[in-house]
């Protein structure tokens, strides 16, 4: 069942986003048919990988969550993500990308190399909605939305941001290909595996 089409992508959505409505899941899985998503959700619930609960009032909806057993699939998704990153940095016609998907690459490739430094934030403007990476005391977290006063803003194609994070491109190369940098570029040197060589 875990190897069935879309199953691991559903697990990924719930790992990144936490409790989700059915409509949130569908929006995060471009291309999935409604009936197939319903079937997969039933199978995952029967297998004990997800659970449902009512949202607190006044919202009348159901939220889906991973169970502990479902969360145990995180290393599987990590391994697949690390293996597949080489394909994420190449342009591909028709590929869709969602802002919250930056959470996995950020976990793979970014580290706070100055945990005693001040909190910083990087706003990512790509895909359907902006995302923010917040770095505080050695911990990186990713969320949807904007930052009030981001230290750095990266704006452009998702693949360019992914390539920069993965070390496939320097900042100069990413800028040459269209990635825009606004703010303190030295923030990249704090989180990237190798110096970014600012454009």
Residue positions per predicted region:
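CheY-like receiver
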Residues: 45, 54-57
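Basic, amphipathic "hinge/linker" alpha-helix immediately C-terminal to the N-terminal HTH DNA-binding motif
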Residues: 3, 56-79
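Basic amphipathic alpha-helical segments that dock to polyanions
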Residues: 37-47
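Acidic, aliphatic-rich amphipathic alpha-helical segments
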Residues: 69-132, 185-199
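N-terminal helix-turn-helix DNA-binding core of bacterial DNA-binding proteins
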Residues: 1-32, 47
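C-terminal interaction segments
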Residues: 147-199
């Amino acid at each position: 069942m875990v190897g069935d089409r879309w199953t691991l992508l559903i697990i990924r959505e719930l790992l990144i986003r936490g409790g989700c409505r059915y409509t949130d899941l569908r929006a995060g899985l471009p291309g999935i048919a409604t009936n197939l998503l319903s079937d997969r959700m039933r199978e995952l619930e029967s297998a004990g990988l997800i659970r449902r609960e009512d949202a607190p009032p006044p919202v009348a909806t159901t939220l889906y969550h991973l169970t502990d057993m479902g969360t145990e699939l995180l290393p599987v998704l990590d391994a697949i993500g690390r293996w597949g990153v080489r394909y994420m940095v190449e342009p591909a016609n028709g590929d869709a990308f969602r802002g919250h998907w930056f959470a996995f690459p950020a976990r793979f490739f970014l580290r706070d190399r100055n945990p005693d430094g001040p909190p910083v934030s990087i706003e990512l403007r790509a895909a359907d909605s902006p995302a923010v990476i917040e770095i505080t005391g050695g911990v990186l977290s990713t969320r949807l939305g904007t930052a009030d006063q981001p230290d750095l803003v990266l704006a452009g194609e998702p693949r360019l941001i992914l390539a920069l994070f993965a070390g496939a491109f320097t900042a100069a190369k990413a800028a040459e290909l269209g990635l825009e940098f606004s703010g303190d570029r030295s923030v990249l040197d704090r989180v990237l595996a190798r110096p970014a060589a600012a454009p």
